[in-house]
Amino acid sequence: ADRAGPPRDMVGRCGDYRCFWSLNFALSARTFQEVGGFDPRYVGYGGEDTDFGRTVAAQGLPLWWVRGAKAYHQYHKHHMPPVHHLDSVLANAQVFADKWGEPTMQHWLRAFRLMGLIEPDPAGGWTKLQDPVESHLALTRQQEHQPYASSSLVLEQLESQARRGSDASRAPAMAPA
């Protein structure tokens, strides 16, 4: 699922390690070093924030949200789920699973599977079936009317299409004329 949103109050503790997002975070350099920093096995996009948040939580450090904290980030076109980072998401999902014994980025992986980009492999990982094409990019691209791209909206649309497809396959066959 998507990350939890900010708290109702100005400051709130988040008990879910997935709240960590390196787009905007603060801690002392000493604490960062004591925690071990970011795991260098994560290459490219995907999973590195979740891993760092999990590491912080595993060491007993609390995560806090600060509502209204300002972060300036250079605009760039992006996609959610990030189909344009398919290869690194797949590789990093495996790094996370090997390290923590459980998967991460399941919502993205589910969407990639529904798009026909990947399938599960017998070892519990994922096999890439194809690179994303323009229709995948169009589906996941941030739209002008949206403040951000949303994996949840894309996944809802894909799940709905899958349900309609499965419902159609279960419909009784028409009798021959």
Name each region found by the language model.
Residues 15-31, 121-124, 144-147, 153-163:
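Short, charge-rich amphipathic segments
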Residues 135-177:
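Membrane-interface aromatic/basic loop that binds lipid-linked glycans or pyrophosphate carriers
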Residues 13-15, 36-39, 78:
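A short, structure-level motif marking secondary-structure boundaries and short turns
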Residues 1-4, 25-42, 108, 124-136:
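Charged, low-complexity, helix/coiled-coil-prone segments
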Residues 58, 62-131:
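Active-site-adjacent helix/loop segment of glycosyltransferases
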